[in-house]
């Protein structure tokens, strides 16, 4: 694999990672049914994947060129992707523990898992991720080694090094500290927790079949709780498959220095695989989780496809501005310089207000009637929701909301 092919694939992954994970965050923002503690951790994971596309992949491409830089500047580029990897691992671990509590001790879930605690845990995870990933910046690096053929090029000025990952980040840090302590151990812990989740669920289902007890959870309720655990277990498994190959190569490089170094094409492939994991999660949400899938469709139809059609139709430009009032939201449109509230033909625009916060524009005196659950638009329609929802203390996985959503299900 040539460097040009590697760079092209990395750029495609970056774009897909940004778009897909922005869609995840957007879905949680606009759909109150998705605003629960579990999905707060999902948003944290999506934020790390967005940062991979925005920062980590450009940094990796830059390092692959072997440019000349100050050692600590190169070190920051090399270590930042480790910060995001660590944040992803911590997010997956918190999601796993959240699901374990919901299934094993559901009656105590509301008291143990609250929004305030979830936000605090997310903040702690990000602080720890930066501390672990940027540890080489504090001295555990190769910058203090004498400059030789390994980490210095004659083409670089004095005080600069050829910026390559293995030349500035020591392999003992990558293997013992980063991989063994903070990648492998959390992955094994998640594996053990998911095994306990599925074994406990299987045992409870067998008890329900043999001797149903009054007051126990129904079979359908338990299955609704196990289904998201399966989806999240798939995400953890794919994360392990994507990140382990590169770490295994690092182990071979460290424990067998006399062995031949991995060929460039294999290094490129494992790096692409580790970054490609950032694209996978939104696809799993869309395929496995109904509420996410429906919200994705509404976003794409309402904010992408219909807007494109409006801009193409007749060359008429429309600018929409929303003014908030205590009773709800109002919409005023200006078409081709005409004042707000008046169409080009002189007829008045009469926006229909609804108590639930949704606003429906009237086009040419004709009402664009829609049901509450339909997010498709008529000729001109602005769909807005005043109330973004609050984080429910009880997970929607156990008690589905009245609107029929189910968080991560």
Curated annotation (Swiss-Prot):
Q: How is it modified after translation?
A: Ubiquitinated. Deubiquitinated by USP4; leading to stabilization and expression at the cell surface.
SUPFAM superfamilies annotated for this entry? Answer: Family A G protein-coupled receptor-like
Q: Which Gene3D superfamilies match?
A: Rhodopsin 7-helix transmembrane proteins (1.20.1070.10)
**PROSITE patterns for this protein:** G_PROTEIN_RECEP_F1_1, G_PROTEIN_RECEP_F1_2
Which of UniProt's keywords are assigned here? Cell membrane, Disulfide bond, G-protein coupled receptor, Glycoprotein, Membrane, Receptor, Transducer, Transmembrane, Transmembrane helix, Ubl conjugation
What GO biological process, any one, is recorded here?
adenylate cyclase-activating G protein-coupled receptor signaling pathway
Membrane-topology descriptor: Multi-pass membrane protein
Please give the Gene Ontology molecular function terms for this protein: G protein-coupled adenosine receptor activity
Transmembrane regions listed in the UniProt entry: 5-29, 40-63, 75-97, 118-140, 171-195, 232-255, 264-287
Tell me which Pfam families the record gives. 7tm_1
- Which cysteines link up through disulfide bonds? 68-156, 71-143, 74-163, 256-259
PANTHER family referenced in this protein's UniProt entry, alphabetically: ADENOSINE RECEPTOR A2A (PTHR24246:SF47), OLFACTORY RECEPTOR AND ADENOSINE RECEPTOR (PTHR24246)
Q: How does it assemble?
A: Interacts (via cytoplasmic C-terminal domain) with USP4; the interaction is direct. May interact with DRD4. Interacts with NECAB2. Interacts (via cytoplasmic C-terminal domain) with GAS2L2; interaction enhances receptor-mediated adenylyl cyclase activity.
Q: What's noted about domains in the record?
A: The cytoplasmic C-terminal domain is necessary for targeting the non-ubiquitinated form of this protein to the cell surface.
Would you tell me the protein name for this molecule? Adenosine receptor A2a
**Organism of derivation:** Cavia porcellus (Guinea pig)
């Amino acid at each position: 694999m040539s460097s040009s092919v590697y760079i092209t694939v990395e750029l495609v992954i970056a774009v897909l990672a940004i778009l897909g994970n922005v869609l995840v965050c957007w879905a949680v923002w606009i759909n109150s049914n998705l605003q629960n503690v579990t999905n707060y951790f999902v948003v944290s994971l999506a934020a790390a994947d967005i940062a991979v596309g925005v920062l980590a992949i450009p940094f990796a491409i830059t390092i692959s060129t072997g440019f000349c830089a100050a050692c600590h500047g190169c070190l920051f580029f090399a270590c930042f992707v480790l910060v995001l990897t660590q944040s992803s691992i911590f997010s997956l671990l918190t999601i796993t523990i959240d699901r374990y509590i919901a299934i094993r001790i559901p009656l105590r879930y509301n008291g143990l898992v609250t929004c305030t605690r979830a936000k605090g845990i997310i903040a702690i995870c990000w602080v720890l991720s930066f501390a672990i990933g940027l540890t080489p910046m504090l001295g555990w690096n190769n910058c203090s080694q004498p400059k030789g053929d390994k980490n210095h090029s004659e083409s670089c000025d004095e005080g600069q090094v050829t910026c390559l990952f293995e030349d500035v980040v020591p392999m003992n840090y990558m293997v013992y500290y980063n991989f063994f302590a903070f990648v492998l151990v959390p992955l094994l812990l998640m594996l053990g927790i998911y095994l306990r989740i599925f074994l406990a669920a299987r045992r409870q289902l067998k008890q329900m079949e043999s001797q149903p007890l009054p007051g126990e959870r129904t079979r359908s309720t338990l299955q609704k709780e196990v289904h998201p655990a399966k989806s999240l277990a798939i995400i953890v498994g794919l994360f392990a498959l994507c990140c382990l190959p590169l770490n295994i190569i690092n182990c071979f490089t460290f424990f067998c220095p006399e062995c031949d170094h991995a060929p460039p094409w294999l290094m490129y492939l494992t790096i692409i695989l580790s970054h490609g994991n950032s694209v996978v999660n939104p696809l799993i949400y869309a395929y496995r989780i109904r509420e996410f899938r429906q919200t994705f469709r509404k976003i794409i139809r309402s904010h992408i496809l219909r807007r494109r059609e409006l801009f193409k139709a007749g060359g008429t430009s429309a600018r929409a501005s929303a003014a908030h009032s205590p009773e709800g939201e109002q919409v005023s449109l200006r078409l081709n310089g005409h004042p707000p509230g008046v169409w080009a033909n002189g007829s008045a625009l009469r926006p229909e207000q609804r108590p639930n916060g949704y606003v429906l524009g009237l086009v040419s005196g004709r009402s664009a009637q829609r049901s509450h659950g339909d997010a498709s638009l008529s000729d001109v329609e602005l769909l807005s929701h005043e109330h973004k929802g609050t984080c429910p203390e009880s997970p929607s996985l156990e008690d589905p909301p009245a609107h029929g959503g189910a968080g991560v299900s």
